[in-house]
Amino acid sequence: MKTLVIASLSGGQGKTTTAFFLGKLLSQSAKVLFIDADPQSNLTFFLGHEVEPSAPTLLELIKDMVEPADAVYSLANSNQFLIPSDDGLSNAQEYLASSGMGAVVLKARLKPLSEYFDYCIIDSPPARTQISIATIGAADQLLIPAEASTKGVNSLIRTLEIVQSLEKLGAFTGSILGVIPFRDKWFGLSQSKDSAGAIAAMKEVAPQLRIFPSILESERYKQALNQGILLSELGYPDLEKPFEGVKEALGIKQLVQI
């Protein structure tokens, strides 16, 4: 199982959007385990899962209260599975902080599941917390969405800083797959100056990293999320280019549409 963490240390950077559509695309040819590591639980909602009272979630998995398999739920698609979250996930902060091994706890908890799935997609929380540190520590590869704005550039910088600090401690042993610009604004065939400037700044901040095609500013993403479907199913396959680019980077050949 390859664990791909979607991380960016600010809100509104496209983490859940990226996790949802990338995981859906990968599940066309592989078994995918989604993990919602954000107490806001947006990924859980968009994937159509409702957490039942007393049902195991990521919190119970992190705290080693259940067997890993007991926190995994099957979704409508037979190749898609989910470890959900709810607002109780915030209670994991103290546990991770006091464990002395917070950065590696999630990686250890997921190890027994590795033989059952091809990919694990983790939607990380939007702040520098013990949970976000644990998700980064679990990553084989890290994908950083960043809004095509000054806020997005700052989020990229902060994310790279925490990755570097964890790498120095030996808590992050993976690699950074690249950056996906989010909410790239275009007016017809013309890109906005703010978006162009922000993406140029991203390239300056991280010249060694691959910049994937942008997630454009479009209501179509929200429509597809709300319906729980791919953009291609909505009739807008061109808007999936960022996620197809990530598939290519992962070494997965694009499926031929018949």
From Swiss-Prot:
Recorded consequence of changing D38A: Binds DNA in the presence of ATP and Mg(2+), probably does not hydrolyze ATP, 7-fold reduction in ATP affinity. DNA-binding is significantly reduced
Which Gene Ontology molecular-function terms are recorded?
A: ATP binding; DNA binding; hydrolase activity
Residues annotated as site: McdA subfamily signature lysine residue: K151
Sites binding Mg(2+) sit at T16
Question: Taking the first listed entry, what is the main subcellular location of this protein, grouped into a coarse class?
Answer: cytoplasm
Q: What is its EC number?
A: 3.6.4.-
Would you name any one GO CC term? Answer: cytoplasm
Q: Which residues cross the membrane?
A: none
Asked whether the UniProt record includes Nucleotide-binding among its keywords, one would answer yes
Task: Decide whether keyword NADP is in the record.
Answer: no
Residue numbers binding ATP 2 in other subunit: E147, K151, R183
Q: Which domain of life is it from?
A: Bacteria
Q: Which reaction does it catalyse?
A: ATP + H2O = ADP + phosphate + H(+)
Q: Which UniProt keywords apply?
A: ATP-binding, Carbon dioxide fixation, Cytoplasm, DNA-binding, Hydrolase, Nucleotide-binding, Plasmid
Where in or outside the cell is it found? Answer: Cytoplasm; Cytoplasm, Nucleoid
**What are its GO biological-process terms?**
carbon fixation
| Cross-referenced InterPro entries | AAA_dom (IPR025669), DNA_Partitioning_ATPase (IPR050678), P-loop_NTPase (IPR027417)
Positions annotated to bind ATP 1: G11, G12, Q13, G14, K15, T16, T17, Q40, F182, L216, E217, S218, Y221
EC category: hydrolase
- Name the family: Belongs to the ParA family. McdA subfamily.
How is this protein organized at the quaternary level? Homodimerizes in the presence of ATP, making extra nucleotide contacts than with ADP or AMP-PNP. Each subunit binds 1 ATP molecule; Glu-147, Lys-151 and Arg-183 cross the dimer interface to contact ATP in the other subunit, while Phe-182, Arg-183 and Tyr-221 stack with the adenine base in their own subunit. Forms a complex with McdB.
Copy the domain comment: Has an adenine-nucleotide sandwich dimer structure in common with ParA ATPases. Nucleotide-binding forces changes that create an ATP-binding pocket.
Q: What else is known?
A: A type 1 McdA protein.
What is the role of the protein in this entry?
Answer: McdA and McdB together mediate carboxysome (Cb) spacing, size, ultrastructure and probably inheritance in the cell, together they prevent Cb aggregation. McdA is an ATPase that forms dynamic gradients on the nucleoid in response to adapter protein McdB, which associates with carboxysomes. The interplay between McdA gradients on the nucleoid and McdB-bound carboxysomes result in the equal spacing of Cbs along the cell length. Incorrect positioning (aggregation) of carboxysomes results in reduced CO(2) fixation by encapsulated ribulose-1,5-bisphosphate carboxylase (RuBisCO, cbbL/cbbS), which leads to slower growth.
* Name of the molecule in the record: Maintenance of carboxysome distribution protein A
Q: Report the gene name.
A: mcdA
